[in-house]
């Protein structure tokens, strides 16, 4: 199965099961440690993740709130950069050839590696999609083409401030799914206005004909359910990382990885159970 096929297949499985939305957890590669990342990814899949977003640590993460920033800092302190992230994806692929993995990060590490070299390395590692926070869609046609040539989906962010023209532009180049940022500001901030999200998704779907995931501000089962009633995927990052952070802080020095992984799996499973109660419209009973 090729990389872009894995994303489509994941959303197809969700639909065939009658579920309203896919569950996409976000973690920072290398947090709580490089050794924990691959076991953590497998634990998230066991908990019910349909796709996994893997953050590439960067020293100036302008779109990330304090929780995700701390995770990136911990990873960088342990020597995790883009090349190590690709190695971790390849390690994950040895035991899981089904679950899509999407890298989320910033342009600088990709530019240092070279766009074409990165696209080829991502494909070789088993990456399914790439979301670069600070690449505007009107400037990335060449990079998107390189990714597509390598079978990797270029994924883009949309925000409450996105104009219809920008939505239309992204609809032309995005593959896999698009990620709607439900709040203004950084990750982990604010509270959700579900009605506003629903209105914006209706506008997005006029121009975007692939699944639309929603993230930012989803912190518990109730908010996940509200978003799942409207979105094709629910993306959860800050609260998941915070849950691991707290579990690790309470564990002994030699048990921090295990405690963080167990807490993540348990917490994400509660979200998956909540999402399973939200059924897709016209789904079989």
Curated annotation (Swiss-Prot):
Q: What Pfam families is this protein classified in? A: Trp_syntA
Task: Show the GO MF annotations.
Answer: tryptophan synthase activity
| Keyword Amino-acid biosynthesis on entry | yes
User: Which residues carry out catalysis?
Assistant: 53, 64
Q: What class of enzyme is it?
A: lyase
Q: Which reactions appear under catalytic activity for this entry?
A: (1S,2R)-1-C-(indol-3-yl)glycerol 3-phosphate + L-serine = D-glyceraldehyde 3-phosphate + L-tryptophan + H2O
Q: Which CDD domains match?
A: Tryptophan_synthase_alpha
What are the record's GO terms for cellular component?
cytosol
Entry EC no(s):
4.2.1.20
Task: Check the record and name the InterPro entries matching this protein.
Answer: Aldolase_TIM, RibuloseP-bd_barrel, Trp_synthase_alpha_AS, Trp_synthase_suA
- What's the domain of life for this entry? Bacteria
Pathway note: Amino-acid biosynthesis; L-tryptophan biosynthesis; L-tryptophan from chorismate: step 5/5
Q: Does the keyword Mitochondrion apply?
A: no
Name the keywords, alphabetized.
Amino-acid biosynthesis, Aromatic amino acid biosynthesis, Lyase, Tryptophan biosynthesis
The family annotation for this protein states: Belongs to the TrpA family.
Q: How does it assemble?
A: Tetramer of two alpha and two beta chains.
Q: What does this protein do?
A: The alpha subunit is responsible for the aldol cleavage of indoleglycerol phosphate to indole and glyceraldehyde 3-phosphate.
What name has this protein been given in UniProt? Tryptophan synthase alpha chain
- Source organism per entry reads Bordetella bronchiseptica (strain ATCC BAA-588 / NCTC 13252 / RB50) (Alcaligenes bronchisepticus)
What gene does this protein come from?
trpA
């Amino acid at each position: 199965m090729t990389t872009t096929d894995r994303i489509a297949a994941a959303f197809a499985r969700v639909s065939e099961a009658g579920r309203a939305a896919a569950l996409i957890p976000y973690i920072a590669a290398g947090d709580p440690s490089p050794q924990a990342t691959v076991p953590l990814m497998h634990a998230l899949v066991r908990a019910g993740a349909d796709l996994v977003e893997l953050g590439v640590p960067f020293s100036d993460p302008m779109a990330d709130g304090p929780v995700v920033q701390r995770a990136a800092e911990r990873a960088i302190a342990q020597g995790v950069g883009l090349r190590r992230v690709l190695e971790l994806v390849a390690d994950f692929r040895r035991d899981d050839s089904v679950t899509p993995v999407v890298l989320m990060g910033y342009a600088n590490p990709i530019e240092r590696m070279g766009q074409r070299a990165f696209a080829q390395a991502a494909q070789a590692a088993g990456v399914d999609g790439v979301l670069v926070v600070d690449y505007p869609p009107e400037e990335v046609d060449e990079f998107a083409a390189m990714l597509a040539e390598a079978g990797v989906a270029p994924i883009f962010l949309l925000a409450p401030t996105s104009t219809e023209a920008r939505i239309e532009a992204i609809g032309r180049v995005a593959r896999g799914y698009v990620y709607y940022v439900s709040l203004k500001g950084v990750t982990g901030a604010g509270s959700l206005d579900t009605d506003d999200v629903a209105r914006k998704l209706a506008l997005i779907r006029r121009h975007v004909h692939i699944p639309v995931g929603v993230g930012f501000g989803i912190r518990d089962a109730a908010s996940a359910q509200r978003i799942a009633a409207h979105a094709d995927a629910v993306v959860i990052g800050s609260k998941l990382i915070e849950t691991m952070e707290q579990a690790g802080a309470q564990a002994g020095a030699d048990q921090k990885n295990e405690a963080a992984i167990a807490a993540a799996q348990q917490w994400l499973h509660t979200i998956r159970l909540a999402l399973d109660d939200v059924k897709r419209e016209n789904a079989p009973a």
